[in-house]
Amino acid sequence: MASLKDLEGKWRLVESHGFEDYMKELGVGLALRKMGAMAKPDCIITLDGNNLTVKTESTVKTTVFSCTLGEKFDETTADGRKTETVCTFTDGALVQHQKWEGKESTITRKLKDGKMVVECVMNNAICTRVYEKVQ
């Protein structure tokens, strides 16, 4: 089973399925969904003890959040939502659970065959994005 340390590094998106449907379920407008679907972001994960930083960079937008594992924090997402978020490391996966306005979404990052597989879920919308390590 992977450790959190195994997820640390710079990852580049190489495959994406269902992202536009997931964004639509989140309530993202059409124009931003189209731009988001075209973006090929890098995800940079850094650790300092129990402190986690996740930076997502693309030509469209760069977002960063930092948190302490297991503690709630206020996150502003790439699409502008203000969420109450908690990140945990459970069963070899980094789980990011967001809550806002009575809604919930979960983003799970885990290693599979040397790649980082990210699953984004809200209601029945499920998105899978695959990243390869570049650093």
Curated annotation (Swiss-Prot):
Transmembrane segments: none annotated. PANTHER family: FATTY ACID BINDING PROTEIN. InterPro entries: Calycin (IPR012674), Fatty_acid-bd (IPR000463), ILBP (IPR031259), Lipocln_cytosolic_FA-bd_dom (IPR000566). The modification N-acetylalanine is found at A2. Hexadecanoate binds at Y131. It is found in: Cytoplasm; Nucleus; Synapse; Postsynaptic density. Monomer. GO terms for molecular function: fatty acid binding; identical protein binding; long-chain fatty acid transmembrane transporter activity; retinoic acid binding. The modification Phosphoserine is found at S3. Forms a beta-barrel structure that accommodates hydrophobic ligands in its interior. It comes from Rattus norvegicus (Rat). This is Fatty acid-binding protein 5. Belongs to the calycin superfamily. Fatty-acid binding protein (FABP) family.
